[in-house]
């Protein structure tokens, strides 16, 4: 599921952001953003000049200088507001999570068994390794692993999903989260973390903007922006002595004022992206949480945007996960109804989706009704990992169904013969992407039940989109190569790994990484932990084991393996937003150059009026218009920074062309229109002469 998203400009968030924007005027906060720190210094300098003019300490227009100073302060405040609004949204999410933390008591056990005596202690006093008993109605006091028992657990406080889930000892569903509630039965849980280190505590820390560290790409972009700013600072600094020399040489004109030079500098440096960069990063983490995915850092979100190989589990991601019986294929000399009757009998007590589907198919094909095993004096033989088959004993009949090699051993151990024709049936089912289940009665092989993996609707189209983006999809399955190849062809994946083991997955990831690729995968079991730790983007399922969650750098609260595709989408959207706004910000400089340079030097060099292509009213209105536009464009781009640019699956080259046209050419044209409109408004209001 997806968490309900707050409105972008929710009044309560806006009020808080306005207050925080003022608090961020603290120099200790401002110097962390080098680009905006230059604007901050410029604001202080022009304010000092304005006060000096008012005090008759220097010459100049108090109205013009005061207006420039005011709009420079607005530029700083708008950038502060963008960051504060993004952080405010994250803090609101953190507060809602913090609200789920309750002070609770725990029933501490002396040992790992339920029968031991319990001691009532505060949940905050529990330490890693402590064992607790949690019964129906109790809140689970800590993150941990289920040692004994099984229970229905309400995890809605963490996941937002109202449907309860089953947590039990052993297997891949043994991990529990502190703050969730047991609805029925009981669990013996061993705490896996100390207080303050729980999953909920980590979630809160991750989504709070104050805890966010800059990602490598952000650091690289900041270095670029600082370099551009230094270039423009040096270029602007040379204009003052150049202006003095020009006035002396021409015996006319006027020296460019410090106020105009500060205005020029602020308009030329990349203030738009400088003011929004932090907000984009915070918003990316926030959007990931909106998809019910917790990222351990911005680095993980950023890596998701660069991923070019996806390793996807077949079951639950590419297929629906519940294989359905689709056909009865009898052995030579066996009637189809005889096979269906035996298969149904062996499945009457089988509660797996496959077993239930065999009962239903026999009923549909031959109107075979369910029978009472007790009335038949039958004994059900459950499936086990050792025998790899299940079945039923009815009086003197011994019916078994299972994997082909398991049934072959069973038949041969009963002095029977496994027909070549059945081997051929098994191979034909595997070639079409099905899973063959062989049925035998005593030493006699009756035939094959074909189980069909149902490929999810629309998944093939999603893989086509990923291919357009240059992302390779690899299906991971434990099936034999024939079955895997058939399902891979039907689903449209680029490659597959059959008969996959944890070691094979780890080797495949390392192989792709050695080729310079970034790999993303999902996992939920302890056996997935090595591969999750190796992958660049590792999404662990919340329903999985503690080892899997600790190995991953993201946790999907919905435990939906398909979410990996959405994670990549959000990562790419964040990178695109940053790149698009950087392009727009730098392209903006051209129009501001044409606005301010002619205005600054027109008195000394009237010929520069030829560069006044926008036909701005006067030097003062031209400079004012450029400064006002420079401030307002930050406000207008806040929604884009927080929501992200619209994203369409396409190749990197096509995306680059699209964004250069949209944000590059747009960044060139929009300021010309905006500055001209502001100039007309200033003249109409008689604000600038």
From Swiss-Prot:
It is found in: Cell inner membrane. It is a multi-pass membrane protein. InterPro entries: ATPase_P-typ_cyto_dom_N (IPR023299), ATPase_P-typ_P_site (IPR018303), ATPase_P-typ_TM_dom_sf (IPR023298), ATPase_P-typ_transduc_dom_A_sf (IPR008250), HAD-like_sf (IPR036412), HAD_sf (IPR023214), P-type_ATPase_bsu_IA (IPR006391), P_typ_ATPase (IPR001757). Coiled coil: none annotated. Its main location: membrane. Keywords: ATP-binding, Cell inner membrane, Cell membrane, Ion transport, Magnesium, Membrane, Metal-binding, Nucleotide-binding, Phosphoprotein, Potassium, Potassium transport, Translocase, Transmembrane, Transmembrane helix, Transport. Belongs to the cation transport ATPase (P-type) (TC 3.A.3) family. Type IA subfamily. This is Potassium-transporting ATPase ATP-binding subunit. It comes from Serratia proteamaculans (strain 568).
């Amino acid at each position: 599921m997806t968490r309900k998203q707050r409105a972008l400009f929710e009044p309560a968030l806006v009020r808080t952001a306005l207050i925080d924007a003022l608090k961020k005027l603290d120099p200790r906060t401002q110097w962390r953003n080098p680009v905006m720190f230059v604007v901050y210094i410029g604001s202080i300098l022009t304010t000092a000049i304005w006060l000096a003019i008012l005090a008759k300490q220097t010459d100049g227009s108090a109205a013009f200088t005061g207006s420039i100073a005011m709009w420079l302060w607005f530029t700083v405040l708008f950038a502060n507001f963008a960051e504060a609004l993004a952080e405010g949204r994250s803090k609101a999410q953190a507060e809602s999570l913090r609200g789920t933390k309750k002070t609770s008591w725990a029933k501490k056990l002396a040992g790992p068994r339920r029968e031991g005596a319990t001691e009532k202690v505060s949940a905050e006093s529990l330490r890693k390794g402590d064992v607790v008993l949690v019964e129906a109605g109790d809140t689970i006091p800590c993150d941990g692993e289920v040692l004994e028992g099984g229970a229905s657990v309400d995890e809605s406080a963490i996941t937002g999903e109202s449907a309860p889930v089953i947590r039990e000892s052993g297997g891949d569903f043994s991990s529990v989260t502190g703050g969730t509630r047991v609805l029925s039965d009981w669990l013996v849980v061993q705490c896996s973390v100390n207080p303050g280190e729980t999953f909920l505590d980590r979630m809160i820390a991750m989504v709070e903007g104050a805890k966010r560290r800059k990602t490598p790409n952000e650091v690289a972009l900041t270095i670029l922006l600082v370099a551009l700013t230094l270039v423009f600072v040096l270029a602007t600094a040379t204009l003052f002595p150049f202006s003095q020399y020009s006035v002396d040489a021409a015996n006319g004109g006027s020296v460019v004022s410090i106020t105009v030079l500060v205005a020029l500098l602020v308009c030329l440096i990349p203030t738009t992206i400088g003011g929004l960069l932090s907000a984009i990063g915070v918003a990316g983490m926030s959007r990931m949480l909106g998809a019910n995915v917790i990222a351990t850092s911005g680095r993980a979100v950023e890596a998701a945007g660069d991923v070019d190989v996806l390793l996807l589990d077949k079951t639950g991601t590419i297929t629906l996960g519940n294989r359905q019986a689709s056909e009865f294929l009898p052995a030579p000399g066996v009637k189809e109804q005889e096979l269906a009757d035996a298969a149904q009998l062996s499945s009457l007590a089988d509660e797996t989706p496959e077993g239930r589907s065999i009962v239903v198919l026999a009923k549909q094909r031959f109107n075979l009704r369910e029978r009472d095993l007790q009335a038949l004096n039958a004994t059900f033989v459950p499936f086990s990992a050792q025998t790899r088959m299940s079945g039923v004993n009815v009086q003197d009949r011994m019916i078994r169904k299972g994997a082909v090699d398991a049934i072959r051993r069973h038949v041969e151990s009963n002095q029977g013969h496994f027909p070549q024709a059945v081997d051929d049936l098994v191979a034909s089912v595997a070639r079409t992407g099905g899973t063959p289940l062989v049925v035998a009665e005593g030493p006699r092989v009756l035939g094959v039940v074909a189980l069909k993996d149902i490929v999810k609707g629309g998944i093939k189209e999603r893989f086509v989109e990923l291919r357009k983006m240059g992302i390779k999809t690899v299906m991971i399955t434990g099936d034999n190569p024939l079955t895997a190849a058939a399902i891979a062809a039907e689903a449209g994946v680029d490659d597959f790994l059959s008969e996959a083991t944890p070691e094979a997955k780890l080797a495949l990831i390392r192989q792709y990484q050695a080729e310079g690729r970034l790999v993303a995968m999902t996992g939920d079991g302890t056996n997935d932990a090595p591969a999750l730790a190796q992958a660049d983007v590792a999404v662990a399922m919340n329903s999985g084991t503690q080892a899997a969650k600790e190995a991953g750098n993201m946790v999907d609260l919905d435990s939906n393996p398909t979410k990996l595709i959405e994670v990549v989408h959000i990562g790419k959207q964040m990178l695109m937003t940053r790149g698009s706004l950087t392009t727009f910000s730098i392209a903006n400089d051209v129009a501001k150059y044409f606005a301010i340079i002619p205005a600054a030097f027109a008195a000394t060099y009237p010929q520069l009026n030829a560069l006044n292509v926008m036909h701005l009213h006067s030097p003062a209105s031209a400079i004012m218009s450029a400064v006002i536009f420079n401030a307002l464009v930050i406000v207008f781009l806040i929604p884009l920074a927080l929501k992200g640019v619209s994203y369409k699956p396409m190749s990197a080259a096509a995306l680059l062309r699209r964004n250069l046209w949209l944000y590059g050419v747009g960044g060139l044209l929009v300021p010309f229109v905006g500055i001209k409109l502001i100039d007309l408004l200033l003249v109409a209001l008689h604000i600038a002469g």
